[in-house]
Structure formats: structure tokens, C-alpha cells
Amino acid sequence: MKNIKQLLDYAYTNPNAAIKYTASNMSLWIDSDAAYLVAPKSRSRVAGYYYLSDTPKQPIQANPSFNAPVLVECKILRFVQSSSTEAEIGGLFHNMKTALPLRETLAELGHPQLLTPVKTDNATAHKFAHDDIKHARSKHMDMRYYWVKDKET
């Protein structure tokens, strides 16, 4: 009932709301974010915004033409994170795993995927994913986050 009320409130407040999709090459893009220690029991929240745009150029442009999202993912991480960087890497891990079936579906529909650009707003998490950080200082991070490095896009 609460969700229905929220939807009706949104529809009343935004009577001219629209979702806009423009023609693109159907390449999947991800915008990943995390909020550190904002949920109960010292947990962190992650969000993923998955949208389709043109094929990325090299180097990947910072601001592609945005379409409305094909998927928006919000979740609370199960484990307590020890830093904002670890929360961001947890968000990258979750969002990149969520993108795998989307990439496969797009490929099966005739839109092969090259790189899937993933944007994060944390410089340390970006450096960690691109192997530009000293490993001795990142040992506190769980081994499952090394998956992000293996799947680096």
C-alpha cells in the first residue's frame, strides 16, 4: 500500500513526466554509486543506473548522450564496509555482476557489446579497478572485490 501511495503521489506531483529514449547503438553504460554508513546497522547503500547509449569511443567520453534507464538497481550491502572506497568497490562489484545478463541479452538481440563503461565517483575505487593503487594499502578489502579488476572494462 505504501508503494502505491508513493506512485500516486509522484504521478500527482509530476503530471507531465515522460521517459525519453533516443536512437543509439544500444551499448550498455553503467553509472555506479555507493553511500557509506547510511543504512541501519552500519551498512552502506549502493545504486546502479543502467542505460543505453552510443558505442564508447577510446578514450571513453565522460558524458555520453543519456537515455532513460533500462534498469535502476538500489540495494543495501549485506556486509559492513570499512571505508567509503570499499563501499564503492562493493557497488562496482554488485553493478557489474548485475550487468552481465543485460549484456548477454543485448548480444542475443543482435546488439553485440564491446566495452561496458562503468562510471564511479570515487577516485580511489577507480584507481583500484584500474590497478593504479599499491596493493599493500588495499589488503583490507575482501578478495571478492578482485573480481572487479578481472572484469575491468
Regions found by a protein language model. Give the residues of each.
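RNase H-like nuclease module associated with reverse transcription
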Residues: 78-153
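Short acidic, Gly/Ser-rich segments with clustered Asp/Glu that frequently serve as metal-coordination loops
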Residues: 34-43, 48, 124-126
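Two-metal-ion RNase H-like nuclease active-site motif
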Residues: 21, 26-41
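A short acidic-Thr-Gly-centered motif at the start of a beta-strand
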Residues: 16-26, 107-111
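A short, polar/acidic, helix/strand-boundary loop motif
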Residues: 54-90
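Residues immediately flanking
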Residues: 32-34, 54, 120-122
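C-terminal reverse transcriptase regions that engage the nucleic-acid substrate
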Residues: 1-16
